[in-house]
């Protein structure tokens, strides 16, 4: 059995795809992310990512001014020269934003025009008109795919799909070695020149639930086998992930004792989570595995909503959520009414709606944070659990009088 997906009429898009820069520029250490956008894009990146300009981060915004509206194509050569002189990148990602998309800028041609012999400039569609913010990583990985060497058919190794920090990557390498699973690498790797070979013998193991498109391309264009499993979030997901990966490589492993020990280490968090009612609004495409983890941790999932659900890519997660109300493209007005009626203990909500919910006395958590945190695998389980328990513990320490509507009367919209 599998959870029945209810589809409503809410917005498919939740937050700007440009924010994928926040974790990807740190992952791909010889890259530069150049956004063609407006002052709004620049303010978004600086404020959301919290990086000051004088820190000289490896991302920037080529600003579109009013005079550019009459030009056929923006002039970027001088900006590329400056990036090369200051940062010496091996690859530059040129990200689209809403305004140049509306202007019909021909990004593919623009990227080719400013590429150098030893410095590819790769177009990445990341506009909020087309993608949720986590899906923009999918676009970056699709841009990298042509630069992955073609592996021979007899090269039977694993490629982990999705960006994770170096500590989590080391954890996956260590666990694979312990289980005797040969690894070709990660997509993306820490350096552009180290991209893994991918071919018909490759087993692709997705680490993130928002990479359905690039996974499909790897299967179609390279003949790779894309593993279908739970995503490695929490002890339950991590056990299933490694057991299924071992099976795909012709090995049989039993990690039940490893899972039991992992849950045991999480007991201080589980004491807080058991019996709590949790409501997911839609934001980052990570809702399904997060809800599955919480359900197995003892929570009651009132609703798990996501902007987009891929029935094939998310099949195992949907099966694990059988009996849970799962909604695609939820109507937020309806959700507000349900939150008011059901009174959840915790709401996982968007950056834009969390503070207003808190203003109405709801205990809420930014869903945006999960994309930036090391929550995968055995080593990430405690971080994952802590992200749910922290707002609950913080609220429990507040004076009960702070929940009185008097404190927000007239401040928050009704």
UniProtKB/Swiss-Prot annotation:
Top EC class for this record: oxidoreductase
Residues reported to bind [4Fe-4S] cluster: 16, 41, 98
Pathway involvement of the protein, from the record: Porphyrin-containing compound metabolism; bacteriochlorophyll biosynthesis (light-independent)
Keyword Acetylation: no
Gene Ontology process terms (BP): light-independent bacteriochlorophyll biosynthetic process; photosynthesis, dark reaction
Keyword line: 4Fe-4S, ATP-binding, Bacteriochlorophyll biosynthesis, Chlorophyll biosynthesis, Iron, Iron-sulfur, Metal-binding, Nucleotide-binding, Oxidoreductase, Photosynthesis
Cofactor binding note of this UniProt entry: Binds 1 [4Fe-4S] cluster per heterodimer. The cluster is bound at the heterodimer interface by residues from both subunits.
Catalytic activity: chlorophyllide a + oxidized 2[4Fe-4S]-[ferredoxin] + 2 ADP + 2 phosphate = protochlorophyllide a + reduced 2[4Fe-4S]-[ferredoxin] + 2 ATP + 2 H2O
One GO molecular-function entry: oxidoreductase activity, acting on the CH-CH group of donors, iron-sulfur protein as acceptor
EC numbers, comma separated: 1.3.7.7
InterPro entries: LIPOR_BchN/ChlN, Nase/OxRdtase_comp1, Protochl_reductN
Cofactor dependence: [4Fe-4S] cluster
UniProt cross-references to HAMAP family, sorted A to Z: ChlN_BchN
UniProt function note: Component of the dark-operative protochlorophyllide reductase (DPOR) that uses Mg-ATP and reduced ferredoxin to reduce ring D of protochlorophyllide (Pchlide) to form chlorophyllide a (Chlide). This reaction is light-independent. The NB-protein (BchN-BchB) is the catalytic component of the complex.
Quaternary structure (record): Protochlorophyllide reductase is composed of three subunits; BchL, BchN and BchB. Forms a heterotetramer of two BchB and two BchN subunits.
Record family assignment: Belongs to the BchN/ChlN family.
Protein name (record): Light-independent protochlorophyllide reductase subunit N
